[in-house]
Swiss-Prot record:
The PRC barrel domain binds ribosomal protein uS19. Binds ribosomal protein uS19. Residues 96-166 form the PRC barrel domain. An accessory protein needed during the final step in the assembly of 30S ribosomal subunit, possibly for assembly of the head region. Essential for efficient processing of 16S rRNA. May be needed both before and after RbfA during the maturation of 16S rRNA. It has affinity for free ribosomal 30S subunits but not for 70S ribosomes. One of its GO terms (molecular function) is ribosome binding. This is Ribosome maturation factor RimM. GO terms for cellular component: cytoplasm; ribosome. It is found in: Cytoplasm. The gene is rimM. It comes from Acidiphilium cryptum (strain JF-5). Keywords: Chaperone, Cytoplasm, Ribosome biogenesis, rRNA processing.
Length: 169
């Protein structure tokens, strides 16, 4: 079972006076976020019910212990609350060439000749295209030209460093 927690969204500022909040999602399917078993940093179950684009009502807790956030003050206390889901609870990718960015973290990065380049430490996406960060601190564009092969079962990714990337020694 894969218990890694994947950040899926963040609760923002309150919306109105009845406990609704703005929610920033990191999911390609923001509506589907409400269907996932979300948890916060403390492990509490967080439920979302969308009321508009990026606006949701929130419940904290499970079963009989679940409490609906019903006023602006309670909603304000949730500002910046991070919403996670266990990797095992995410649906499998639909295509064999698809994967979650989280699955890349920890893969061994090897050159086309098989030489070890380190491991993938992080995947960043700041809006202009994803990039991978290697354990040596290199930040490379996550494109098919730079990462032509990903072997999840084998735990490795082939990385072709672009010519214009300076090498540090």
């Amino acid at each position: 079972m894969d218990d890694r927690l994947i950040l899926m969204g963040v609760i923002g500022r309150p919306h109105g006076v009845r406990g609704a909040v703005h929610v920033t999602t990191y999911s390609p399917d923001p509506e589907g976020l409400a269907e996932l078993p979300l948890r916060d940093e403390r492990g509490r179950r967080v439920g979302l019910a969308w009321t508009g684009a990026g606006i949701a009502r929130v419940t904290i807790g499970e079963g009989d212990e679940a409490a609906a956030i019903a006023d602006r003050d309670a909603a304000a206390k949730l500002t910046n609350l991070r919403l996670y889901v266990r990797r095992a609870d995410l649906p499998p990718p639909e295509d064999e060439d698809e994967f979650y960015f989280a699955d890349l973290i920890g893969l061994h990065a090897v050159g086309p000749d098989g030489a070890a380049l380190g491991t993938i430490r992080a995947v960043h996406d700041f809006g202009a295209g994803a990039s991978i960060e290697l354990s040596d601190g290199s930040l490379l564009p996550f494109t098919r030209a730079v990462v032509p092969e990903i072997d999840l079962p084998g735990g490795r990714a082939v990385v072709v460093r672009p010519v214009e990337v300076e090498m540090r020694e």
